[in-house]
Amino acid sequence: GQGSLAYPGLRTQGNLETLGGPNDATRGLTSLADTFEHVIEELLDEQQVIQPSKENKDADLYSSRVMLSSQVPLEPPLLFLLEEYKNYLDAANMSMRVRRHSDPARRGELSVCDSTSEWVTAAEKKTAVDMSGATVTVLEKVPVPKGQLKQXFYETKCSSKGYAKEGCRGIDKRYWNSQCRTTQSYVRALT
């Protein structure tokens, strides 16, 4: 399709034949970059269906922060990466002048508070609070036909170092007090 890839400023076009010269074995195969772009576009289209509507309030609880896996994932959730890619595509549709002024790298843009994100297993997070305020036990392992899957949560917390104790960035400390705090959110999980 039209558009850019996940790597800003890089757009690979054509197929393996045009990229690597004529070769009967690769004739007609699309490039890996074009295939990747197509898969991302399909996932973004599917994500649009999941977006909450006024009629479906349960969709508000949809979250990519919970995963069932045989081991703790090493990378952030796919939907976070898709959101970053979608934001890049949205920025690519702006005019060059607007994009130049909104590009974080050009303005030295920083987060208001430093944070760290990591996967935490249910073995480390044994209890949680449900939407009615009751404390519930989090299911650590889920039995499946070929063994067990562990339940893992992707948590983002305020960083213990940096500006958390000194207040938030961009706040005039002469007139305002500020504090970075980790907030709680609800996700769908097995309890």
UniProtKB/Swiss-Prot annotation:
Keyword annotations of the record: Cleavage on pair of basic residues, Disulfide bond, Glycoprotein, Growth factor, Secreted
One Gene Ontology MF term: nerve growth factor receptor binding
Cellular compartments per GO CC: axon; dendrite; extracellular space; synaptic vesicle
Annotated disulfide bonds: 113-180
Domain of life: Eukaryota
Subcellular location, principal: secreted
InterPro entries, alphabetized: Brain-der_neurotrophic_factor, Cystine-knot_cytokine, Nerve_growth_factor-like, Nerve_growth_factor-rel, Nerve_growth_factor_CS
Region annotated Disordered, chain positions: 1-23
PROSITE patterns from the UniProt entry: NGF_1, NGF_2
SMART domains: NGF
Propeptide feature ranges: 1-100
Compartment(s) of residence: Secreted
A Pfam family that the UniProt record links to this protein: NGF
Record: glycosylation sites: 93
Example GO BP: cell surface receptor protein tyrosine kinase signaling pathway
Function: Promotes the survival of neuronal populations that are all located either in the central nervous system or directly connected to it.
Name of this protein: Neurotrophic factor BDNF precursor form
Lineage of the species this protein comes from: Eukaryota, Metazoa, Chordata, Craniata, Vertebrata
